[in-house]
């Protein structure tokens, strides 16, 4: 009887230990972003992109859609008329590393891209693969805060890790028509694991 009570007390203590050591659930690191900037090289012009990012530990996976438009401005009766010299669409899948330090992060990625360039001067389309590379930084809230609407004036709901970030991105594509560019990045999502 004594040994039975002794074993029962140990099983009770160990079962309590398992219940007390439940892990705290945290959010995934998932965010979307828009980038606006300028590129130069084999392609030049205005660059706009939209990307979806997922991070597991320090590994970052990014799917990106980008467009590069080279405009020429002509004048007709004192009215500026834009003409598209070339337009490029790019679909990219990138893998890389991302490191978070409080309310700041930096990343570097590389991958593969499919590009389609329409040259308006000679009315020809080029399709080719490339190797995109990017390096970037982001600044965001380091702690959970209430989400704010109306330009940050009205707080809504409970404190959340979901929020905005701002950053700078240097990017390039090594391909038949290579380029290098710099842009401003705006993101929305969960930028780090909040507790």
Q: What are these model-predicted stretches?
A:
Residues 42-55, 91-101, 120-125:
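Generic detector of contiguous secondary-structure segments
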Residues 31-35, 76-79, 165-168:
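Extracytoplasmic loops and strand-loop junctions of Gram-negative outer membrane beta-barrel proteins
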Residues 29, 43-47, 88-90, 128-130, ...:
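Membrane-spanning beta-strands of outer-membrane beta-barrel proteins
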Residues 61-63, 69, 84-93, 101:
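Short, well-structured hydrophobic secondary-structure segments
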Residues 84-86, 96-195:
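Outer-membrane beta-barrel transmembrane domain signature
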Residues 1-26, 192-195:
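Cleavable N-terminal export/targeting peptides
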Residues 16-69, 187-189:
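Short glycine/proline- and aromatic-enriched beta-strand/turn motifs that initiate or cap beta-hairpins
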Residues 23-25, 37-41, 65-86, 117-128, ...:
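Extracellular/periplasm-exposed beta-strand and loop segments of Gram-negative cell-envelope proteins
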């Amino acid at each position: 009887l004594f040994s039975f009570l002794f074993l029962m007390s140990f099983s009770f203590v160990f079962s309590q230990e398992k219940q007390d050591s439940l892990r705290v659930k945290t959010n995934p690191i998932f965010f979307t972003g828009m980038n606006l900037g300028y590129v130069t090289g084999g392609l030049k012009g205005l660059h706009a992109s939209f990307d979806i990012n997922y991070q597991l530990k320090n590994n970052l996976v990014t799917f990106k859609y980008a467009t590069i438009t080279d405009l020429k401005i002509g004048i007709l009766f004192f009215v500026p008329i834009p003409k598209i010299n070339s337009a490029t669409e790019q679909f990219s899948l990138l893998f890389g590393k991302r490191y978070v330090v409080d309310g700041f992060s930096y990343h570097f990625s590389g991958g593969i891209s499919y590009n389609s360039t329409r040259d308006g001067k000679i009315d020809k389309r080029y399709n080719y693969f490339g190797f995109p590379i990017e390096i970037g930084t982001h600044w965001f809230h380091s702690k959970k805060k209430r989400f704010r609407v109306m330009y940050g004036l009205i707080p809504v709901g409970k404190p959340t890790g979901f929020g905005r970030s701002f950053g700078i991105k240097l990017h390039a594509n090594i391909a038949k028509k290579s380029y290098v560019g710099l842009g401003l990045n705006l993101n929305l999502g969960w930028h780090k694991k909040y507790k």
